[in-house]
Curated annotation (Swiss-Prot):
Gene3D superfamilies noted in UniProt: Protein tyrosine phosphatase superfamily
Catalytic activity: O-phospho-L-tyrosyl-[protein] + H2O = L-tyrosyl-[protein] + phosphate
Protein name according to UniProt: Tyrosine-protein phosphatase 19
Catalytic activity, EC: 3.1.3.48
Broadest EC class assigned to this enzyme: hydrolase
Organism: Styela plicata
Tree of life domain: Eukaryota
GO molecular function list: protein tyrosine phosphatase activity
Residues the record lists as binding substrate: 83
Length: 115
C-alpha cells in the first residue's frame, strides 16, 4: 500500500483468486466489504464491491497517516481464470479490460496502473 500511496496509483488489476483448488494463491491485501483494515501506516476501507460476470470491482478509500492524504483506488479482480488452464472464453476478460481502461481514463491520473 505504501507503493500505491507513493506513486498515487488509482487502479489495480488482479487476475487470480486468493484460493484455487483449496490452495492459497495470493495474499489478500484488502479489507472485507464495508470494513477498514490497517496495513502498517495505511488504512484501507473497502467502500464498495460490485460483482460483474466474471470479475469484481472494488472501490477502496486509502488513508495514509504519514502522507496525510486520502485517495480512491479501484481494484478489478478477474475471478473466472481456472487453475492451470485458460478460460473457455475471453468475453468476460475483454469486458473487464474495457471497464479497467474506462476507469483508468476517468481518474485523470498519469500514475501507473498496478497489475
Amino acid at each position: 500500500w505504501l507503493m500505491i500511496v507513493e506513486q498515487k496509483c488509482r487502479v489495480i488489476v488482479m487476475l487470480a483468486k486468493c484460493f484455487e483448488a483449496g490452495k492459497k494463491k495470493c495474499q489478500k491485501y484488502w479489507s472485507d466489504s464495508k470494513e477498514t483494515k490497517k496495513f502498517g501506516r495505511v488504512k484501507v476501507f473497502n467502500a464498495e464491491e460490485v460483482k460483474y460476470c466474471g470479475f469484481l470491482r472494488r472501490k477502496f478509500l486509502i488513508e495514509s497517516v504519514d502522507e496525510g492524504i486520502t485517495m480512491k483506488v479501484f481494484q478489478y479482480q478477474y475471478i473466472n481464470w481456472p487453475d492451470h488452464c485458460v478460460p473457455n472464453t475471453t468475453s468476460n476478460l475483454v469486458r473487464m479490460h474495457k471497464y479497467v481502461i474506462q476507469c483508468f481514463e476517468e481518474t485523470g491520473s498519469d500514475a501507473p496502473m498496478v497489475v
